[in-house]
Amino acid sequence: MIKKITKVTLCIILVVSAFSLLMAWRLDVFVKIDEKKPSTCEAIELYGSAEDIEIDYSNGTAYLSILDRKGLIQGKDVQGSIGRIDLNNMPWEIESVFSGEGLDNFRPHGLSIYGNTLAAINHPKERGKDPESIETFAISSKGIEHDKTLISPLLESPNDLVLVAEDKLYIGNDNMFNSNINSFEKIQQQLGRPYSTIVFYDGADMSIAAKNLASVSGLNVTEEGYIIASETNAKRMRVLKQLDDGKLEKLGAISLDGSPDNISISGDKIVVAQVASVSSLIQHFISLQKGDYKPSPSKIESLVFESDKSNYVRKREIMFLSLGEDISTASVGVQWDDKLLIGSITDDKIYVCQLGE
């Protein structure tokens, strides 16, 4: 009897230990941040934080998803905007090109550009209750003009999106609001079990393109047409192939040390922002709720994508890694010539660094 009890106790200890180690890995408890940054960086102040930045490389224009997310965390009723930078004219200045005109509410998140179309995820005031939407815009020399609003029950918790044509796009759902799973499954989801989806819009209707993903927080498309999706809870980027009917076939994955967020792609280079320490990010959000400020580390990594390699990566490089005292909670990194632009979840600025020094 005593031996049986001892075995049961040991099994319980092993299970608890394994669970604790898994949570420690998920939360980056043992991560040590050794800063690596360009020597020359400067901040451009904003009237909110730029969670996502998209560059139109054909004409050198950057679009920013701007919202007072710090105020949002503190329970304030805030409205956002889309900002624009002419990257060809120095010094860079940010102008607002859309502030929700014609919409009852505008709280932008992920952005995407294709040709003369810009698309933005728009969150409602009552997330989880009111419908999420995708707003599309026509781009012209004068600015951007709102075109249409796309709504579907499949948009449960949209985080990012990517246009693959002017009237076709993929939308990634993260794990914040998912009505299709129970409370126990939500706990498993936080541990990395994949319950998230990618939705396809074909110009008329929406459908599920891919299932069982670990919280999609970033989406983009390579020159060859592969969809790259951030699986934040699994610390990896998923490589997917577009099929003729819009569905996505899972091909493989790119492992990362951090939890990936937004992805930018230019040529064969992928630039991905990562949460370097989830535990620090949680502490950052808690401090904001209390009216304090505790920075969270920021990480930007570049990878040279090669579709015929087994791990899809020819080269990796840390472009920016800091404790967050210069820019905290980095959510996006985009490269323009020899400059790196970094946006943040909560910091009211973008950070611009000179590369190659």
What are these regions (language model features)?
Residues 50, 69-71, 75-115, 119-124, ...:
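Blade-loop segments of beta-propeller domains
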Residues 27-49, 93-96, 144, 312-323:
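A short helix->beta-strand "capping" segment at the edge of beta-propeller domains
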Residues 99-164, 172, 176-177, 183-185:
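Asp-box/WD-like beta-propeller blade repeats and closely related beta-sheet repeat scaffolds
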Residues 79-88, 131-141, 188-203, 292-308:
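Beta-propeller blade signature
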Residues 64-78, 121-129, 171-193, 273-297:
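Short, conserved, GDST-rich strand-edge loop motifs in beta-rich repeat architectures
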Residues 47-56, 100-116, 152-168, 192-197, ...:
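Beta-rich, blade/repeat-based domains predominating
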Residues 42-80, 327-332, 346:
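Beta-strand-rich domains and repeat architectures in extracellular enzymes and scaffolds
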Residues 257-320:
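Loop/turn-rich, solvent-exposed surfaces of beta-rich toroidal or solenoidal domains
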